[in-house]
Amino acid sequence: KVIIDSVDYSSYSIDDDTVHLNRHLKDKEYWYSTYFHELAHSTGIKGRLNRETFANYETSEDLKAQEECIAEMTASMLCADCNLSSFDTSCSLSYANTVAYIQAWKKKIKDWGSTFIYLASEAEKAYAMIMGIQ
């Protein structure tokens, strides 16, 4: 379920299995990117992909950072499928913005080198679930 409400930020709520989107997102591309990011988080719950990174999001900064990277990678794949991504850095949905977001979280991941492949694999699973290609 998706609710576009007046919250100051967008999020996924496990309590009611709902993506909450800020009604003030700046443009269509950014809206979809944010929606896909939060939708990716929703795949981590028990009964779906049951990701440790989602289950322990609030208890470990390392796992929180990993979950954010998974969600952003998944959103990037979905945006590319919808032709919403761009190499134009003036575009609000440029690959540069995605890279910057992931790099910010990367600093909090203890062993980035061995973790990156796992994160990409988890993002691919989330993407497949959302697209219904499992």
Predicted regions and their residues:
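Active-site scaffold of zinc-dependent metalloenzymes
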Residues: 1-34, 42-50
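Surface-exposed loop/turn and secondary-structure junction residues enriched for glycine/proline
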Residues: 12-15, 24, 52, 72, ...
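Post-HEXXH active-site segment of zinc metalloproteases
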Residues: 29, 33, 43-72, 88-102
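Walker B catalytic acidic pair
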Residues: 38
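Long, well-structured alpha-helical subdomains associated
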Residues: 62-63, 76-134
